[in-house]
Regions:
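Glycine-rich, positively charged N-terminal anion/phosphate-binding segment
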Residues: 2-11, 26-102
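Active-site mouth loops of central-metabolism enzymes
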Residues: 19-29, 76-88, 124-125, 162-175
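Alpha/beta enzyme core
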Residues: 93-120, 127-146, 155-223
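N-terminal small/glycine-rich loop or linker at the start of catalytic domains
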Residues: 10-21, 57-75, 110-118, 157-166
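Hydrophobic faces of well-ordered beta-strands that scaffold small-molecule active sites
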Residues: 21-24, 46-48, 76-80, 104, ...
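Active-site beta-loop-alpha junctions enriched in small/polar residues
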Residues: 26, 51-53, 81-83, 109-111, ...
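Alpha/beta catalytic cores of nucleotide-metabolism and tRNA/nucleoside-modifying enzymes
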Residues: 1-17, 21, 27, 32-33, ...
Length: 343
């Protein structure tokens, strides 16, 4: 039996996606403006940055802004985090009411101390029993909120997916128990970032764990891989070596939404072409203008300083540009900085 092509469609519950290159939920980056330019460059599925279940239940407006659908987003996932099953269930209902998103993802991997100490994030990977209760509660909540079909039969309940880590520390590797708990509770897909909570984002992710998870799940639900994907060749290698159904770009996509287009080209044709500097900067401006429309010019210009720093990488004599970027406060400032590169 021949192997399927590396680039292929993926289904998450009732969601049918054209390909298997995803944008991960990344705090401080995965807003609707950035997701939209990733989609334009070939991202097949996108996730919001993580949203606090507690804040949703308290009706925090800032939190609701994080969940907005991008202008070109036909399907997306809202990622929520929390450690209390009842609160997570209520948050899931609010998410569906406010966004009508196609998928809800549960964060069981964030290593940030202020998240972990509440029993959320990677604390759930360490505690499979609580993880089961959280996922079960969210799955039960969304099954009671079946979306209305645009036409034809009902699409069924919104799928719930789970993102885990390999464990708490090297002496406490619990991914297998966490994944089994997620499956038993009704998760429709599992993403794994095979680093421990103690590692944070240091060292290397252990891709051999992905292969073991794929074998353990045995096709019951799709498995997605995340960790150390910084160039198209990394994605190709992960798909070949681990057998995951999809790869999820995080830091590798920051300031580089072109990684989706480049990876698609590599997987389907065996090669890809470098993105011209002009296109990189034009894409940065598209993101800037969308972010300003979603929030404010002031917020967008401050936020885009770090992003334009990434967009300008590889531009000859880019040092002076990046020094000027950290002072940019208006859209006009950015135009002056990049005058000559846009047209």
């Amino acid at each position: 039996m021949s192997k399927p092509p590396l680039y292929h469609p993926v289904s998450i519950g009732n969601i049918n996606l054209k390909g298997n290159l995803f944008l991960a939920p990344v705090a401080g980056y995965s807003d609707s403006a950035f997701r939209s330019v990733c989609i334009e460059n070939g991202a097949c599925f996108t996730y919001t940055e993580m949203v606090s279940a507690e804040a949703l239940v308290r009706k925090n407006l800032k939190t609701e802004i994080l969940m907005r659908r991008a202008c070109n987003e036909s399907a997306y996932a809202v990622q929520i985090f929390g450690g209390e099953p009842e609160v997570m269930a209520e948050a899931a209902r609010i998410v569906l009411e406010k966004t009508h998103c196609e998928c809800i993802d549960i964060n069981c991997g964030c290593p940030v101390p202020k998240i972990v100490k509440t029993g959320a994030g990677s604390a759930l990977t360490r505690d499979p029993d609580r993880l089961f209760k959280v996922v079960e509660a969210v799955v039960g909540a969304v099954r009671r909120v079946v979306p209305e079909p645009v036409e034809g039969p009902s699409p069924g309940p919104t799928p719930v997916t789970v993102k885990i880590r390999s464990g708490w520390e090297q002496k406490q590797i619990t991914w297998r128990e966490a994944a089994q708990a997620a499956l038993d509770a009704g998760a429709s897909a599992i993403t794994i970032h095979p680093r421990t909570k103690a590692q944070g984002y240091e060292g290397h992710s252990d891709w051999s764990i992905m292969r073991q998870l794929v074998e353990m799940v045995n096709g019951r639900v799709p498995v997605f891989g995340s960790g150390d994907l910084f160039k198209p060749e990394d994605a190709k290698k992960m798909l070949e070596e681990t057998g995951v159904d999809a790869v999820m770009f995080a830091r590798g996509a920051m300031g580089n939404p072109f990684i989706f287009k480049d990876t698609t080209s590599l997987l389907t044709t065996g090669t890809y072409e470098p993105v011209p500097a002009q296109v990189r900067i034009q894409t940065g401006f598209a993101e800037l203008e969308r972010l300003a429309a979603e929030t404010s010019e002031q917020h967008a210009c401050l936020e885009m300083r770090k992003r334009f720093h990434a967009y300008s990488k590889g531009i000859p004599n880019g040092g002076p540009l990046r020094k000027a970027i950290v002072q940019a406060a208006t859209i006009e400032d950015y135009h002056k900085i990049f005058d000559g590169l846009l047209f």
